[in-house]
């Protein structure tokens, strides 16, 4: 794990050196706030539930993201106890308050990729907005020096798997949406 952390830190230092700027700081802080506790995705799911046509997708989205938040923060992170980059290398000034808990895997990324997967599988055009937003939220965690690239990669793989499983359950267990009159 030491070699992975060393490699991860090199990437994070390059991001800090080559990309950081006051304007981009604001964008990344905003993106990270959107992803906190899956709030943007749960909100989108809630709005979708108002429509008969998208209710099933909205329910699946809100339920899967809520599950992700719980399972990741209570179970998965406690299995790995990986220190955050901001704790390992304190020479980089944090632009946000230090997040609670362990680093691995990224909860922001997990919820965002799960949501983007569910939305894209339900309707490809939903992915046109969801995938770039998920990518921005995920990248913001590295930019802000609170997650390693390997945290993001693992959460991405897990999110695709969980999103696909949630979609499969949705299509098998929930009634098909009815067209609105």
Task: Label the predicted regions.
Residues 47, 67, 71, 75-76, ...:
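Alpha-helical membrane-inserting segments
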Residues 36, 51-52, 80-81, 145-148:
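Short helix-capping/hinge motifs at transmembrane helix termini and TM-loop junctions
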Residues 47-70:
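Interfacial segments of alpha-helical transmembrane regions
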